């Protein structure tokens, strides 16, 4: 299996009941595969996935790692809408990123190589992260609230010169973790 693939199963009903949609790679629209956008449980058999509540990889993002999610609250959703998904692009296990207070890599900078439950406890003086550089091999999840809570955003290897590039509506980020459970 490539590091970009895996298997995820979406179920219409809670506790893995009802119709099932099995996905092995990018799926930009569940309805194109004959599956309505209502998902009440998910089983991630392999890989780590980013799921969106709208088709075409748009809307609220949910990060799902190997395991079982018997109801939508388990993946921090407030409803059963799900429209698209893709495997997270993992290249290996070397994690490194730089966070910047300002757009275009300006202002206060902080380097991370491991999980951080509260950025301000490590000396980042603001809760605004406006640009990010992800080096190394791994992917990261950034959260709007401390302790890996709230709205989440995925960043993979590359440069993000503004918060809109990771589909955030605002630059508020207070905790960050690595995605390590992807096989």
Swiss-Prot record:
GO biological process, one term: lens development in camera-type eye
Keywords: Eye lens protein, Repeat
PROSITE patterns noted in UniProt: CRYSTALLIN_BETA_GAMMA (PS50915)
Domain Beta/gamma crystallin 'Greek key' span(s) in chain numbering: 6-46, 47-89, 95-136, 138-180
Pfam family, one: Crystall
Domain of life: Eukaryota
Key word Repeat present: yes
Any one GO MF annotation of this record: structural constituent of eye lens
Keyword flag Repeat: yes
Homology family: Belongs to the beta/gamma-crystallin family.
Physiological role: Crystallins are the dominant structural components of the vertebrate eye lens.
The record's note on its domains: Has a two-domain beta-structure, folded into four very similar Greek key motifs.
Quaternary structure note: Monomer.
UniProt name for this protein: Gamma-crystallin N-B
């Amino acid at each position: 299996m490539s590091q970009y693939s895996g298997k995820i199963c979406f179920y219409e009903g809670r506790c893995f009941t009802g119709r099932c949609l099995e996905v092995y790679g990018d799926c930009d629209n569940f309805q194109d595969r004959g599956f309505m956008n209502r998902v009440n449980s998910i089983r991630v058999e392999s890989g780590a996935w980013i799921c969106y509540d709208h088709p075409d990889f748009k809307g609220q993002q949910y990060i799902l790692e190997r395991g079982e999610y018997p109801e939508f609250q388990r993946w921090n959703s407030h409803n059963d809408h799900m429209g698209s998904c893709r495997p997270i692009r993992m290249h290996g296990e070397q994690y490194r990123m730089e966070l910047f207070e300002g757009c275009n890599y300006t202002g206060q900078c902080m380097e991370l190589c491991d999980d951080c439950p509260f950025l301000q406890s490590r000396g980042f003086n603001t809760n605004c992260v406006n640009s990010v550089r992800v080096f190394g091999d791994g992917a990261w999840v950034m959260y709007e609230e401390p302790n890996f809570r709230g709205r989440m955003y995925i960043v993979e290897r590359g440069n993000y010169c503004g918060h809109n590039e990771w589909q955030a509506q605002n630059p508020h980020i207070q905790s960050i973790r690595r995605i390590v459970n992807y096989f």
